[in-house]
Amino acid sequence: MELRSGNSMVVAPKSKGIIDPNTGKLIGSDDRFFHDINAELSDKGFLVTSADALITWARTGSLMWMSFGLACCAIEMMQCSMPHYDNERFGYAPRASPRQSDVMVVAGTLTNKMAPALRKVYDQMPEPRYVISMGSCANGGGYYHYSYSVVRGCDRIVPVDIYVPGCPPTAEALLYGILLLQKKIRRTGSIER
């Protein structure tokens, strides 16, 4: 299937024959990306490209999160899912199982008794997996920092990618943390720890 337009031959994709009234040429015929693809297709008959950009784009637009709500910060995390903020419009949807989740949001005071459960849930998540630490208690122990039963930050148990400060942080702060995580994934393709 080919279409001849002047001196150039268009191989793929098949043109719909829509002509731009301003220029008199086929729409898309002056697109540099379109010409590069057509040149490679007409030369070899197939296209060789990297799927990294596509995978990174899909990964940032479909982050599935799992709640690990331990204390009062979990209320703000729930508020983030309500219609006023609607975090699903950013491609950030909740999942109940760690095996279907990409992101774990640790919200609240992590105790020594709960730490092995946190690690077990983290280990059940598929790669690549990300962790958002939400609130002062999850970040560094918070108000209960000097208690004998409190872990002084969930980063001692699992690697943390984004820290959201506050006691409790607002839903806007969590949304900002989600957007920062997406930006980091877009910039690097993954997050180096």
Curated annotation (Swiss-Prot):
Pfam families: Oxidored_q6. The keyword Transmembrane helix does not apply. Its cofactor is [4Fe-4S] cluster. Keywords: 4Fe-4S, Cell inner membrane, Cell membrane, Iron, Iron-sulfur, Membrane, Metal-binding, NAD, Quinone, Translocase, Transport, Ubiquinone. Disulfide bonds: none annotated. Its main location: membrane. One of its GO terms (cellular component) is respiratory chain complex I. NDH-1 shuttles electrons from NADH, via FMN and iron-sulfur (Fe-S) centers, to quinones in the respiratory chain. The immediate electron acceptor for the enzyme in this species is believed to be ubiquinone. Couples the redox reaction to proton translocation (for every two electrons transferred, four hydrogen ions are translocated across the cytoplasmic membrane), and thus conserves the redox energy in a proton gradient. NDH-1 is composed of 14 different subunits. Subunits NuoB, C, D, E, F, and G constitute the peripheral sector of the complex. Belongs to the complex I 20 kDa subunit family. This is NADH-quinone oxidoreductase subunit B. It comes from Bartonella quintana (strain Toulouse) (Rochalimaea quintana). The gene is nuoB.
